[in-house]
Amino acid sequence: MSLGRSTAHAPGSEDAIARMWGISARVRVKAFSFAWHALLLFALLVGPTRAEPPLSMQQIAPGEYAHRAHDDIATRANKGDIANVGFIVGTRCVAVIDTGGTLAEGRALRQAVRQITPLPVCYVINTHMHPDHIFGNAAFVDDHPQFVGSVKLAQAEASRAENYLRALNRELGDIAEGSEIIGPTQTVDGSATLDLGDRPLTLRTWQTAHTNNDLTVYDEKSGTLWTGDLLFVRCIPVVDGSVVGWLEDITRIKQMNPRHVVPGHGPLDPPWQQSLEAEEQYLAELAGDVREAIRRGATIQQAVDTVGLDQRDKWLLYEIYHRRNVTAAYAELEWEQ
């Protein structure tokens, strides 16, 4: 029964029924009013207020939990769940690392936290500005955490907020309902330490690479590095910053020598040396081939049409992102001295 739709009656039919059963007009009105409010209450109880089911989580190490997302672009089928997210539990509180692509996913992540621990969420850390990592932030507002990100995060989010929201609503429709950008309340410039209670986390910002606001989280206790999108596994790396800077950052990440790695996209806790080397090889060949195209006097379109064609079968989402990567690399390297 639709509560938003009126129901037609024959003229005088309610009066006739009332007379048949001897019901007074006043009692009849009260009875219909009670039934109406009862139906409204029922609709509210069984309606869209139901809690999101918790995200599935994988324990990477004691106290470290991550969700393996879909290797895809955001669609209604995957509900925008396309970036790995998770949380770290200390003795005092919890740090959430990235929150997913919608408010609904953020709520599901919060439910997953509550399945594991009753401890409060004291930090929500965003590894960078991209929408698949940040739109779940609003699910944690009532926990009153510090929202933590690079010192460059707020400006980067503000510059694209309108476009991100428009694209989210276009691709996901009502699945995206309530999603909004919640910016940082605490920023990191260089490095910072957060303590969850017997669990120090080292946060570090990087030079422009995947974006200009990349941030990693290293858990000293378990040796787990959350790379954000500085590491893509199986999915093609996406250049929204600097291919040169990214290659330099990869060299520094290797020197950290973590025991476990949670990448921004792809399988959790992969053989990280092999994964970084595959990403490094792609980016190095991209930069080298684009430099050669520029040296030959090729236009940007000619470079897009010819560079990196041999990479097609090596990476998921190649057809969507590789040509964009060539364009970004050309624009960066064209003015290289």
Where are these regions (language model features)?
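Conserved beta-strand hairpin/beta-sheet module of binuclear metal-dependent hydrolase folds
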Residues: A61-A112, L215-T227
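Metallo-beta-lactamase
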Residues: E52-I60, Q155-W206, T211-N212, E220-K221, ...
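Active-site neighborhood of phospho(di)ester-bond hydrolases with catalytic His/Asp-centered motifs
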Residues: I97-T99, C122-H130, V148-V151, W206, ...
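Active-site HxH/HxHxD metal-binding segment of metal-dependent hydrolases
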Residues: Q111-T187, S191-T193
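C-terminal regulatory/interaction regions
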Residues: R295-Q337
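Divalent-metal (often Zn2+) His-rich catalytic cores of metallo-beta-lactamase-fold enzymes
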Residues: L247-A298, Q302, T306
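Bacterial N-terminal signal peptides
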Residues: S33-V46
